[in-house]
Curated annotation (Swiss-Prot):
Compositional bias segments (type: Basic and acidic residues): 34-43
A cellular component annotation (GO) from this entry: cell periphery
Pfam family, one: Sugar_tr
Protein name in the entry: Low-affinity glucose transporter HXT1
């Protein structure tokens, strides 16, 4: 391999032997003064340096990166395991006997309030952990931060598994384990996005969601395997396996390279160079490593010159920080408002209502569909782009909810709810619930994490991802807590509520979510600095790759009515 790539000739600066970088990056990025100079005004032809080609080392590079990112993404498995197991716990006899209340006939049950609290309080812990504990990633590094939050998660599991008959002890354990998972949901996608190459970033961040679905599926299977026991094996064995997952996660962190962006920010340049070299499987002195390192250094220096980011700058900073922060909050909120947890948290109970003799088996079917559908997203997210997947995923879920809710309302109980349900209607609802899961798992499930991991500059990234994730968890709490009450009052009309949310989601994505497929994290920031319209963002080209006929101004204005491009593929 030649030491200098064919694509460029390195230009020396007057002060050092470094490569000339794209010095026209937004000078106003997150500046406290709020000055947002035109991106084009800061560029001259001599300042634009073509991007250096990555080392041509074959598929081995992708294997190395993929293994590292899968280890980090295993944090999603921990989250998914909780989702898959708690849905079965609330229907298991020993769990009901220990933590529930007694009917007059001697049978045990969980009240709607207690069920909602036990299931949903986990989300409140996650919201707090995402905001408070994610800061560990900035203080000590993403890897160390992940190890610490996994330890906190384990403490919560110990409290839960030690519970004998006090539901509030189990409740407290759920809060503490939620703190750990909240930190994981911020730090895992963050580390993956900062390690992965731009051309594979969407796919590799989506591995986090694949791990969530694998955890949900195996959690369902474990519940199915323990449900016939009559003692605490029903729920303590699934909880006990959490220790194995925590140890695997901690062990994996020993082999994962630290985020080069964090290392540069911490002044550990040699370690950052080694991290980039390990991920790209090439020598530390390779020109591509030098180019990537100096690009990151330039970005970090601009952020450092602007000073420490305050929480207020998430909404007042430049470029377009208010728009970006609100987009992160909305995307994460809308991911919950798809209604996925309606099925995953309460799937066992919901399908008891449609007359199934073994609703645990139905949950396993859901888990299989969810897992393999999410695997499909590894192809779709970087093939079709973020915007297309989000919009057409919303359309697919709307169609599924129309059928699911309509059949549930009009055909499930033809002779009244006090009479046997229609088996045909119940089967139809299960089929369209599976179609819904396919639409969700291939689009909104992974891409919500991809979007928030890509769209924030490093200086405020942990804060932005924390507040966006907190919005997700808060909505998760509200949906999880109130679902038993809402379904008790309106039953399957609930599906129409989620359908309306997905109609709104389609239009929100069209107007406010830009396309970031194939862009580096620094290039995403440049795109925001230029003020590109989201529905034209798929045509945006980074400065270093533009031809002479490229018209950047055309992407900032739209002279035709928006409805003409509303259903376009861009």
């Amino acid at each position: 391999m030649n030491s200098t790539p064919d694509l460029i000739s390195p230009q020396k600066s007057n002060s050092s032997n470094s490569y000339e970088l794209e010095s026209g990056r937004s000078k106003a990025m997150n500046t406290p003064e709020g000055k947002n100079e035109s991106f084009h005004d800061n560029l001259s032809e001599s300042q634009v340096q073509p991007a250096v080609a990555p080392p041509n080392t074959g598929k081995g590079v992708y294997v190395t990166v993929s293994i590292c990112c899968v280890m980090v993404a295993f944090g999603g498995f921990i989250f998914g395991w909780d989702t898959g197991t708690i849905s079965g716990f609330v229907a298991q006899t020993d769990f009901l006997r220990r933590f529930g209340m007694k009917h007059h006939d001697g049978s045990h049950y969980l009240s709607k309030v207690r069920t909602g609290l036990i299931v949903s309080i986990f989300n409140i812990g996650c919201a707090i952990g995402g905001i408070v504990l994610a800061k560990l990633g900035d203080m000590y590094g993403r890897r160390i931060g992940l190890i610490v939050v996994v330890v906190i998660y384990t403490i919560g599991i110990i409290i839960q598994i030690a519970s004998i008959n006090k539901w509030y002890q189990y409740f407290i354990g759920r809060i503490i384990s939620g703190l750990g998972v909240g930190g994981i949901t911020v730090l895992s996608p963050m580390l993956i996005s900062e390690v992965a190459p731009s051309e594979m970033r969407g796919t590799l961040v989506s591995c986090y969601q694949v791990m969530i679905t694998l955890g949900i599926f195996l959690g369902y299977c474990t519940n199915f395997g323990t449900k016939n026991y009559s003692n605490s094996v029903q729920w303590r064995v699934p909880l006990g396996l959490c220790f194995a997952w925590a140890l695997f996660m901690i062990g994996g962190m020993m082999f994962v390279p630290e985020s080069p962006r964090y290392l540069v920010e911490a002044g550990r340049i040699d370690e950052a160079r080694a991290s980039l070299a390990k991920v790209n499987k090439c020598p530390p002195d390779h020109p591509y490593i030098q180019y990537e390192l100096e690009t990151i250094e330039a970005s970090v220096e601009e952020m450092r010159a602007a000073g420490t980011a305050s929480w207020g700058e998430l909404f007042t900073g430049k470029p377009a920080m208010f728009q970006r922060t609100m987009m992160g909050i909305m995307i994460q909120s809308l991911q919950q408002l798809t209604g996925d947890n309606y099925f995953f948290y309460y799937g066992t109970i919901v399908f008891q209502a449609v007359g199934l003799s073994d609703s645990f088996e139905t949950s396993i079917v859901f888990g299989v569909v969810n897992f393999f559908s999410t695997c499909c997203s590894l192809y779709t997210v970087d093939r079709f782009g973020r915007r297309n997947c989000l919009m057409w995923g919303a359309v697919g879920m709307v169609c599924c909810y129309v059928v699911y809710a309509s059949v549930g309302v009009t055909r499930l109980w033809p002779n009244g709810q006090d009479q046997p349900s229609s088996k045909g209607a119940g089967n139809c609802m299960i089929v369209f619930a599976c179609f819904y899961i396919f639409c969700f798992a291939t689009t909104w499930a992974p891409i919500a994490y991809v979007v928030i991991s890509e769209c924030f500059p490093l200086r405020v990234k942990s804060k932005c991802m924390s507040i966006a994730s907190a919005a997700n968890w808060i909505w998760g709490f509200l949906i999880s807590f109130f679902t038993p009450f809402i379904t008790g009052a309106i039953n399957f009309y609930y599906g129409y509520v989620f359908m309306g949310c997905m109609v709104f989601a389609y239009f929100y994505v069209f107007f406010f979510v830009p396309e970031t497929k194939g862009l580096s994290l620094e290039e995403v920031n440049d795109m925001y600095a230029e003020g590109v319209l989201p529905w034209k963002s798929a045509s945006w080209v980074p400065v270093s790759k533009r031809g002479a006929d490229y018209n950047a101004d055309d992407l900032m204005h739209d002279d035709q009515p928006f409805y003409k491009s509303l259903f376009s593929r861009k």
